[in-house]
Amino acid sequence: MFLNSLDLPGQPEDSRIVVAMSGGVDSSVVAGLLKREGYNVIGITLQLYDHGAATHRVGACCAGQDIEDARRVAEMLGIPHYVLDYEKRFREAVIDPFAESYAHGETPVPCIACNQTVKFADLLATARELGADALATGHYIRSRSHGAHRALFRPLDNDRDQSYFLFATTQEQIDYLRFPLGDLPKARVREIAAEMGLVVANKHDSQDICFVPQGKYSDVIAKLRPEAANPGFIVHIDGKILGKHSGIVNYTVGQRRGIGVSTGEALYVVYLDVENARVIVGPREMLETHKLFLRDVNWLGDESLDNFPSQGIEVAVKVRSTRPPHLACLHYKEGVFSVDLLECENGVAPGQACVLYDGNGHEARILGGGFVTHSERAADIEVMLKRVLCNLETKDSVSSQLKTTAS
């Protein structure tokens, strides 16, 4: 059977493709390339967030100017273009959970939730309703045939690798999605945009968190979850109170800058005691993490979870989008996924994504991933952290009893 460039049967003109057009250079080039090849292309733009400063901020995603840019590109290419209002859905599925997670002391990655619940769920369903044979996006990731299905692989341009944000893509979605930019470097994509005369050829790349004006995520969270801005104490890992803070929302595990205390010692956020509004700080070595436990894992590997090797399997993992994958061992037992890191990571926070690969090479296959529930550090560090928390609880209890007696 003849397959076209998207691995679909027949000639390009036999296939209808929906392109998710964000108004940026990448998705615009995808639409242009597919149109040039002869595919029946339909552009769809999701209006996700269009309020206040985010609307006109350079690098905002799916806001007013982006929608206009997508419309202009579609008009130039001669393809139909539709705008779907997904603001309410985006608020419920992405923004609210993001604020809730941060208020609980986690470090969430909203782009993953957006791909998982909006772009690759709702938009994909719309593409099917339009009779499309595939949904194409401008993400930098590769999709190839793998047995009876398709699989995801790291892209040619590792500097633009977006696999970290796509690990939650289900097998059904992977089979339907196409990523034409996976084999192109970003520089070439911009060249193609210029050759096509696209108005977005020199447009800035979008930022990761599109709904946070000027990067002040704390303002968004404090507005939605005021309790996250409750004041509390900054406490050294040795138990000494160093000062006060204006809300857990301003901190994340691993943070060094902007802690708000000066001791002459390089201090990092080691732990967030959300219940008592305490920020625990300490030296960098207190952040060394050796083991991770994951929740909400999307497993795309070939091994059956029913017969998962008792010794685990060798994988590579990413706990940050900008870091290359590092070797580790993945275990699965009684419904629990855990990862033994062969190289320790610093400052891994609950809520972060841990993405799994079949190796640390440039063309590694994505095996899925999950979100960190908690981590384990060296035994002596764990003991020290538990001791300081226990001592603080004891002090609180004594203080409370004294106040009760005095009254």
Curated annotation (Swiss-Prot):
It is found in: Cytoplasm. Keywords: ATP-binding, Cytoplasm, Disulfide bond, Nucleotide-binding, RNA-binding, Transferase, tRNA processing, tRNA-binding. ATP binds at A20, M21, S22, G23, G24, V25, D26, S27, L46, G138. GO terms for molecular function: ATP binding; tRNA binding; tRNA-uridine 2-sulfurtransferase activity. The keyword Glycosyltransferase does not apply. GO terms for biological process: tRNA wobble position uridine thiolation. The keyword Signal does not apply. Its EC number is 2.8.1.13. The active site is at C114 (nucleophile), C210 (cysteine persulfide intermediate). It catalyses: S-sulfanyl-L-cysteinyl-[protein] + uridine(34) in tRNA + AH2 + ATP = 2-thiouridine(34) in tRNA + L-cysteinyl-[protein] + A + AMP + diphosphate + H(+). Disulfide bonds join C114-C210. Residues 160-162 are annotated as: Interaction with tRNA. One of its GO terms (cellular component) is cytoplasm. The record marks H139, Q352 as: Interaction with tRNA. Its main location: cytoplasm. HAMAP family: tRNA_thiouridyl_MnmA. Catalyzes the 2-thiolation of uridine at the wobble position (U34) of tRNA, leading to the formation of s(2)U34. Belongs to the MnmA/TRMU family. This is tRNA-specific 2-thiouridylase MnmA.
